[in-house]
Amino acid sequence: MNEFYQKDIISIKDFSKDQLEQIFQSTDKIISLDPIDRREICKGKTLGYLFYEPSTRTRLSFEAAMASIGGNSLGISDITSSSTQKGESLADTVRIISIYSDAMVLRHPLDGSSRFAAEVSDKPVINAGSGTEEHPTQAIQDLYTIKKEKKKIDRLKIGIVGDLKYGRTVYSLLHGLGNYDVDVRLISPESLRIRSDSTYEIKQKLDYTESTNIEDHIDELDVLYVTRIQKERFPDEEEYLKVKGSYVVGLDLLKQMKDDSIILHPLPRIDEISTDVDKTKNAKYFEQAEYGKYTRAALLGLTLNENGF
């Protein structure tokens, strides 16, 4: 029995290490399949999507993933052109999208929105970003990238730098890393440290240290995960301007890193990684984006097929 069949994907906390490893194996299988065979996995199935916040990579990644396994996609990517402008509730919109699809992807600015949608929908709901809480499919993509590029996850030193307060990818990644034996360094301005309401739960599974100085750690890291400052989540633009550009990864910083270290970023990038880093062997953020297509294809294949694929 495929334990992922019809499963909502709301939080990375809902996945054990064994389940993550099973998803990674399924992703490897997706990559290895002939494209013709791959398109049989979800042939005739439809993925619905509902984006209440802007998205380029995540939405296109899901669409490309579904197309690669033979399925179709439909939905709303510009909420201003939907019936929500007429006052339609999230619950009703979710129900309508569910009628037309076999599974649904939701991005919404409010915390708890994806879990609420899962209660309303009779089809599996996939969280593509829920307020400041989580982004579980990004974390699966990130963990898979680390494993592919470093050949393991256990016993690595991983630095996460940037906006640790508002960046939802950070929380999902930390919970995912809690399944592994890793040394995590959290590097951010004081005002953007990890939220205190999340530290207790994370510390139950993961040891980490906090710092404001990236140069204190950079030469030890196997993985540097860079995040942008989340301008849209600041209540005051003046506060944003105080921390904008706090950390910039450029060639000078790269020279201090291990030769085989890798640099990741969930994207979009603003100014936190210089473009001259892009062509170095350490830059793996575009490969990371490509892996997202395959990890999401694997998740969809597992979610929509009773016996897997």
Curated annotation (Swiss-Prot):
Q: Pathway membership of this protein?
A: Pyrimidine metabolism; UMP biosynthesis via de novo pathway; (S)-dihydroorotate from bicarbonate: step 2/3
Q: Which reaction does it catalyse?
A: carbamoyl phosphate + L-aspartate = N-carbamoyl-L-aspartate + phosphate + H(+)
Residues the record lists as binding carbamoyl phosphate: R57, T58, R107, H135, Q138, L267, P268
The UniProt entry, under PROSITE patterns, shows: CARBAMOYLTRANSFERASE
Assigned EC number: 2.1.3.2
Q: Which GO terms describe its biological process?
A: 'de novo' pyrimidine nucleobase biosynthetic process; 'de novo' UMP biosynthetic process; glutamine metabolic process
Q: Subunit notes for this chain?
A: Heterooligomer of catalytic and regulatory chains.
Protein name listed in UniProt: Aspartate carbamoyltransferase catalytic subunit
Q: What is the lineage of its organism?
A: Archaea, Nitrososphaerota, Nitrososphaeria, Nitrosopumilales, Nitrosopumilaceae
